[in-house]
């Protein structure tokens, strides 16, 4: 009752290409809402709009529709809005293409390389805050 609405933003990263899991290359932003069942469409639409305007690739409810946290905690009817955001590593690090070994993984963190994606994440989180405080 103290917080009539909350947003659970479950964000983590994955290699952009993982042949044993999927073909091709993942978009940089993979948004999962359990096919819209885990959060209000207004929240999802805003996040998608931010990602679409960022210049980074994105998809909603593609390969990653939302894991356990999104599916079990997202309950918009009771004010709990859950969004999974799976980030492809190439969006924030100079990810090696092809086989990985100790010479190319993990790549060093470069704040300048990561800055554009960080700004998009900041806007996504600001949208989440605006959504729960409106």
Where are these regions (language model features)?
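Catalytic cores of processing enzymes, dominated by hydrolases/peptidases
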Residues: 1-95
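His/Asp/Glu-rich mid-to-C-terminal helical/loop segments that flank catalytic regions of hydrolases
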Residues: 97-134
């Amino acid at each position: 009752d103290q917080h009539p609405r909350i947003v659970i933003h479950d964000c983590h990263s994955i290699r952009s290409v993982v042949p044993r899991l999927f073909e091709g290359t993942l978009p940089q932003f993979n948004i999962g809402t359990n096919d819209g069942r885990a959060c209000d469409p207004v929240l999802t639409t805003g996040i998608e709009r931010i990602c679409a305007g960022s210049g980074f690739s994105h998809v909603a409810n593609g390969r990653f529709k939302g894991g356990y946290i999104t599916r079990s905690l997202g309950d918009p009817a009771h004010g709990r809005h859950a969004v999974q955001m799976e980030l492809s590593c190439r969006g924030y690090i100079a990810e090696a293409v092809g086989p990985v070994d100790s010479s190319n993984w993990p790549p060093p963190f470069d704040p300048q390389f990561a800055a554009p994606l960080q700004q998009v994440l900041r806007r996504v989180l600001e949208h989440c805050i605006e959504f729960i405080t409106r």
